[in-house]
């Protein structure tokens, strides 16, 4: 994942949310079931630290984004009703273009991790390792496969949309 140059002032800790913060909140929202959007979720806490917002502020931003989601409204979930013009603009920009959102946000996250001296995270590898059985005995075979780019983001977005059930 390429590291990109983050603009000065992109991550203020108070006041209006920037476009970068809103995009990263939207990226997180796409991958997280609605019931997990709260300030005590360790993933919310971790991302909030990177984007210099409080966990509760990030959770509320995600719930504001949920108010724009027709799938949530269809389930009777209204989210919070304070979506900003920035929330709407980011929703409109990326709703039909997941690839651009995933690439841009993962590059921003990687840049934030580098800036904060955190180890890089290969989300595809982390997802694969989570499914590794504890019994490491078995046969080996050689395989050549094509692998979808940004598969981990796509998988988390789909699972989040279906309540972690397919």
Spans of model-derived segments:
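Short Lys/Arg-enriched helix C-cap and helix-to-coil transition segments
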Residues: 70-90
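Major-groove recognition helix of helix-turn-helix-like DNA-binding domains
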Residues: 53-69
